């Protein structure tokens, strides 16, 4: 069974209570001290970022579905070490990890592009994003201070295109 006990601060049933009855139960709550915290911080900021970046006329169902699918895709992928360190445990998709954690740095550069694409595909965008790769890179840069330095180095390397010739012998 799948149980979403969303009452806060005390869920209708705790994961311990549910697992005492059914050890295979998948339980999600709104609390950060239990696995599978369902919290609007996982969706709203990134949904809005994608919508704002395309100057969307409205947030339509397709954009919300794109947000949900991006979250589901992230949950199935390997969890970065930095997230595991923040939670003090190795996380992988399964009963106790069905949704990414709020501290997953991938959220900022995976959800807004999905939302923006859906908005552009459905005509909600007033200002479509032309360079999606550049957009994703700009989102990554916001979370990683070294990304802007590396981006500059890569840009210089691409522009100079120097050749290196190695002599034999």
Spans of features found by a protein language model:
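Long, charged amphipathic helices and adjacent flexible linkers at domain junctions
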Residues: 128-163
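C-terminal non-catalytic interaction/assembly regions of soluble proteins
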Residues: 56, 112, 116, 152, ...
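Adenosine-phosphate binding glycine-rich loop
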Residues: 3-112, 116-118, 122-123
């Amino acid at each position: 069974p799948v149980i979403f006990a969303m009452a806060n601060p005390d869920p209708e049933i705790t994961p311990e209570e549910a697992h005492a009855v059914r050890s295979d139960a998948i339980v999600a709550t709104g609390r950060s001290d239990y696995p599978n915290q369902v919290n609007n911080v996982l969706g709203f900021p990134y949904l809005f970022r994608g919508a704002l970046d395309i100057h969307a006329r409205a947030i339509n169902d397709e954009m919300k579905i794109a947000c949900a699918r991006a979250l589901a895709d992230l949950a199935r992928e390997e969890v970065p070490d930095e997230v595991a360190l923040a939670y003090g445990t190795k996380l992988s998709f399964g009963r106790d990890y069905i949704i990414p954690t709020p501290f997953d740095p991938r959220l900022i550069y995976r959800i807004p592009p999905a939302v923006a694409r859906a908005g552009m595909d459905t005509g909600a965008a007033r200002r479509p994003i032309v360079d999606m790769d550049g957009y994703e890179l700009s989102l990554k840069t916001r979370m990683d201070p070294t990304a802007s330095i590396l981006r500059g180095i890569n840009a210089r390397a691409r522009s100079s295109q120097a050749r290196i010739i190695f002599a034999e012998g």
